[in-house]
Amino acid sequence: MTIGKNNKMIQHLNYRVRIVLQDSRTFIGTFKAFDKHMNLILGDCEEFRKIRSKNSKVPEREEKRVLGFVLLRGENIVSLTVEGPPPPEEGLPRVPIPGAAPGPGIGRVAGRGMPINLSAVPAGLQGPVRGVGGPAQQHMAPMGRGVPRAPMMGAPPPGMIPGGMPSMPGNMGRGAPPPMRGPPPSMIRGAPPPGRGGY
């Protein structure tokens, strides 16, 4: 069954309604939804039932229960009566107003990819601190023509160990070479001295 916009049931969504069932129970609540079988959903629902006592002298009394959100099966419904219009807060838009300041309860979409703030790098992903590990900044800069290069170390000449000391036969097999203290001045490659051609 296709439900059109002119259907009477749609016109009464969010209204307060009174529903009577076959067993004479009455439900009053906010009409939220329905389907082709006339199953109904009520919000803020209360149940009223009349209890007859076994004594005919005592009049029947009405018992009220607060139920909340209720699904009523269509085959048990006898009547549906509109009690009143929807409460005023139901008609207000649920869309945030552009000028309103967001409060702590405003829902936000979960991030799915690149973070919104691209300038902030998450902790642990910044790389090494300047001066600790990695090459110096001068070595990482792109080089152009005519710009003097930063000092770089070349390979040691034959007969020299990396520590800058000439190898001695007596030192062989006695452990690791002494720690490097930097290259000797003759090993630093920079601009050629004046009067000498190229490299």
From Swiss-Prot:
Swiss-Prot/TrEMBL keywords: Cytoplasm, Methylation, mRNA processing, mRNA splicing, Nucleus, Repeat, Ribonucleoprotein, RNA-binding, Spliceosome
Start-end of Pro residues biased regions: 176-199
Gene Ontology biological-process annotations: germ cell development; gonad development; mRNA splicing, via spliceosome; spermatogenesis
Effect in UniProt of substituting R181L: Unable to localize to the pole plasm
Gene Ontology cellular component terms for the protein in this record: Cajal body; catalytic step 2 spliceosome; cytoplasm; cytosol; nucleus; pole plasm; precatalytic spliceosome; small nuclear ribonucleoprotein complex
Post-translational modification: Symmetrically dimethylated on arginine residues present in the RG repeats by csul (or csul-vls complex) and Art7; methylation is not required for assembly and biogenesis of snRNPs, but required for pole plasm localization.
Assembly: Component of the osk mRNP. Interacts with stau and yps. Interacts with csul (via the N-terminal region). Interacts with vls. Interacts (methylated) with tud. Interacts with Smn; this interaction may be favored by SmB methylation. Interacts with the SMN complex. Interacts with msk and Snup; these interactions are RNA-dependent.
Family note: Belongs to the snRNP SmB/SmN family.
Protein known as: Small nuclear ribonucleoprotein-associated protein B
Organism for this UniProt entry: Drosophila melanogaster (Fruit fly)
